[in-house]
Amino acid sequence: MNAGSPKPRAPACDRNRDPILAVLRGHFAGRRRVLEVGSGTGQHAVYFAGAMPWLEWQASDVAQNLPGIRAWLDDAGLANTPAPLALDVLQPWPEVDADAVFTANTLHIMGWNGVEAFFRGAGRVLSAAPGGMLAAYGPFNYGGGYTSDSNRDFDAWLRARDPQSGIRDFEAVDALASQAGLRLVDDVAMPANNRCLVWRVVSSASG
């Protein structure tokens, strides 16, 4: 991003940030550091870090998106937002000491191999974090069906654009989370036919 160029902006982030925050504020209350995977423009990182100052909010994304994220972080000047990390879910992840992972509107964009890699990576990050949490926001299908006509249309648009992308089945995603050592603790209906899914690390004591 060139000096003086406007920060990237996604209108959807302005619309969904408060409903997401209402979920995260409760589930991340006892957490200390969040790794956000796929921070996109950086809007969520700034908003959530400002609203939850007890958390260190570690933004990350593929390298080409980092300048825009830095622009948001630098403009906000928050003490709890370190420099964003380059993270491609299909490549080795950087070492991050985090006890929560968050992602928004990414699982339907990446291919299924990316979704699998995301849950493996998140599971590794959280494996040493007792009570670690993973939250994912976006559209999901249930029982093999769409939750709305608009989601059906959106899925068709996604697959026409990239056959590897598409709205994911909740059951398949939850199975990946389980394989990564996580158990679903919340599934919250959100505006515009989205969901916020929250998993917790399964402690060894609970088997």
Residue ranges and their predicted role:
Residues 1-29:
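Class I SAM-dependent methyltransferase Rossmann-like catalytic core
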Residues 30-40:
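Conserved class I S-adenosyl-L-methionine
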Residues 93-101:
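A short acidic, Gly/Pro-enriched loop at the edge of an enzyme's catalytic core
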Residues 164-180:
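Short alpha-helix
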Residues 182-207:
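Core SAM-dependent methyltransferase catalytic element
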